[in-house]
């Protein structure tokens, strides 16, 4: 997750300017308008249309945003399911909110990728949340467009499960690999799909994290979760 090069000078210049123009006042807890607008511009580039500032919230890194969502969506005893290998903090965050965890083993023999059949079995157990990570940390695996759409098709059958898709590495692809947006794969569950993205990863600012989430407007349950953040 850590590139071996430093941010460009424009990143440092923007940080200096922000410090020099600091008002000393509290800001919007969702993030400044300029920050949210920059994120909205990015998600439009990856195919997410129909979103506005009200659909977004920022945090001190994607970990902070995912934890906020765990607190908002998961009550004690609820189940969250996600593939293995997984990013190191997923399990800890689930344990902090006293959620149950259903792990889906995805060994090297299947390229560390979850299959639609695996997901179908897991969702039949009625988890509250399905957490998806693409491109993957720690494996570096990237699902193809066809693979993303096959998984998205399965989720249509389970309308009571929230989908959190951790896509913070979507602009860090190599070897001709392409990213496919999971939230936009099927309109049927878009209102309960929550995209996690990063503002610091693509600019290599690991010491200055900024995470962002976006959810579609119009879903009553999505609005309820947002209000609890």
For every predicted segment, state its role:
Residues 1-61, 68:
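N-terminal small-domain helix-loop-helix segment of the aminotransferase-like
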Residues 13, 186-229:
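Conserved core segment of the aminotransferase class I/II
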Residues 50-56, 76-79, 126, 190-193:
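Short acidic capping loops at alpha-helix termini that bridge into adjacent secondary structure
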Residues 72-94:
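Conserved PLP-anchoring active-site segment centered on the Schiff-base-forming lysine
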Residues 78, 99, 155-162, 190-191:
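A short helix->loop->beta-strand "cap" motif at the edges of active sites that frequently abuts
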Residues 84, 100-108:
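Short beta->alpha connector loops at strand-helix junctions that form conserved
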Residues 107-177:
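Active-site phosphate-binding strand-loop segment of PLP-dependent enzymes
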């Amino acid at each position: 997750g850590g590139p071996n090069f430093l941010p460009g000078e424009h990143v440092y210049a923007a940080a200096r300017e922000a410090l020099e123009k600091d008002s000393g006042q509290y800001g919007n807890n969702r993030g400044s308008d300029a920050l949210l607008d920059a994120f909205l511009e990015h998600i439009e580039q990856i195919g997410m249309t129909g979103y506005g500032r009200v659909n977004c919230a920022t945090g001190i890194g994607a970990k902070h945003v995912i934890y906020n969502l765990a607190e908002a969506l998961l009550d004690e005893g609820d189940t969250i399911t996600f593939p293995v290998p997984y990013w190191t903090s997923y399990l800890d965050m689930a344990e902090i909110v006293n959620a149950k965890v259903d792990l889906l083993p995805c060994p090297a023999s299947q390229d560390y990728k979850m299959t639609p059949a695996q997901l179908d079995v897991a969702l039949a157990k009625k988890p509250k949340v399905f957490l998806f990570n693409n491109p993957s940390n720690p494996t570096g695996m990237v699902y193809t467009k066809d693979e993303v759409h096959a998984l998205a098709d399965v989720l249509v059958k389970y309308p009571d499960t929230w989908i959190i898709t951790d896509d913070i590495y979507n602009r860090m692809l190599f070897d001709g690999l392409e990213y496919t947006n999971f939230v936009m794969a099927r309109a049927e569950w878009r209102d309960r799909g929550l995209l996690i993205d990063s503002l610091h990863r693509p600019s290599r600012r690991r010491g200055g994290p900024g995470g962002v989430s976006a959810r579609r407007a119009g879903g009553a349950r999505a609005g309820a979760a947002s209000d609890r953040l």
